[in-house]
From Swiss-Prot:
Membrane-crossing segments per the record: none
UniProt tissue specificity: Expressed by the venom duct.
Post-translational modification note: Contains 2 disulfide bonds.
Domain writeup: The cysteine framework is XIV (C-C-C-C).
Pro-piece positions: 20-49
GO MF annotation, one: toxin activity
Keywords associated with the record: Antimicrobial, Cleavage on pair of basic residues, Disulfide bond, Ion channel impairing toxin, Neurotoxin, Secreted, Signal, Toxin
Its biological purpose: Probable neurotoxin with unknown target. Possibly targets ion channels. This peptide could be considered as an apoptosis activator in some cancers (tested on lung and breast cancer cell lines). Provokes the decrease of H1299 lung cancer cells viability after 24 hours treatment, and induces a high Bax/Bcl-2 ratio, which suggests that this peptide can activate apoptosis in H1299 cells.
Organism classification: Eukaryota, Metazoa, Spiralia, Lophotrochozoa, Mollusca
UniProt similarity note: Belongs to the conotoxin L superfamily.
Signal peptide limits: 1-19
Major subcellular site: secreted
UniProt-recorded name of the protein: Conotoxin Cl14.1a
One GO location term (cellular component): extracellular region
Amino acid sequence: MNVTAMFIVLLLTMPLTDGFNIRAINGGELFGLVQRDAGNALDHGFYRRGDCPPWCVGARCRAEKC
């Protein structure tokens, strides 16, 4: 496997690893309110930072309905 392929694989797996680590730090609650975003695999940790994902705006974000 060359360096380019390894780099692409690393980029694809980083969000999944990040989500797993966040769950482990938060006590491993897989289905708690903090972990409702399925391990940050899609939004790359928006909830952890307190921001809103790009597809959620305004009052929906403040009401946590995303």
